[in-house]
């Protein structure tokens, strides 16, 4: 999919205004669906949103970013809290918030061999060096959660 052409198409169909800048995929975006850059007018989009939720949700995110874009160039309130932004977003059926992507960080679960306590950690624990904080028993790697 040529992203810039798709954004131009959505802009004309849903807003009736032309998109004159570039749109890019940005793999570094984690918690947001897209970003508008007023300095040079380009838009960034999160490819994981498109891959995870499909074209219908992605189109609503494109509408959200285009609402920022068009309001900025019309000299109106383009920020999330501005009335102009909220009204335009409602008119074009854009998403107010990006759907959350699942947190890809998993936990390691350690089990105390003495008291059975479960301890969750993101990083590995040196089992030769560390013990249970409750009973000082030995730990063993139980599972990845």
Swiss-Prot record:
The lineage of its organism: Bacteria, Bacillati, Bacillota, Bacilli, Lactobacillales. Binds 1 zinc ion. The keyword S-adenosyl-L-methionine does not apply. One of its GO terms (biological process) is response to stress. It comes from the Bacteria. It is found in: Cytoplasm. GO terms for molecular function: zinc ion binding. Its main location: cytoplasm. Residues 5-141 form the SprT-like domain. Belongs to the SprT family. NCBIfam families: PRK04351.1. Zn(2+) binds at residues 64, 68. Keywords: Cytoplasm, Metal-binding, Zinc. This is Protein SprT-like. It comes from Streptococcus sanguinis (strain SK36). GO terms for cellular component: cytoplasm. Its cofactor is Zn(2+). The active site is at 65.
């Amino acid at each position: 999919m040529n992203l810039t052409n798709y954004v131009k198409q959505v802009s004309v169909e849903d807003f009736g205004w032309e998109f004159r800048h570039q749109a890019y995929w940005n793999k570094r975006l984690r918690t947001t669906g897209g970003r508008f850059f007023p300095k040079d007018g380009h838009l960034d989009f999160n490819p994981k949103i498109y891959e995870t939720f499909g074209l219908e949700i992605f189109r609503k995110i494109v509408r959200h970013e285009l609402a920022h874009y068009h309001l900025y160039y019309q000299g109106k309130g383009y920020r999330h809290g501005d009335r102009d932004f909220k009204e335009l977003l409602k008119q074009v059926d854009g998403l107010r918030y990006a759907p959350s992507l699942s947190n890809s960080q998993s936990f390691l679960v350690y089990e105390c061999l003495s008291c059975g306590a479960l301890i969750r950690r993101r990083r590995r624990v040196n089992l030769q060096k560390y013990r249970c904080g409750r009973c000082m028993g030995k730990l063993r790697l139980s599972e990845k959660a």
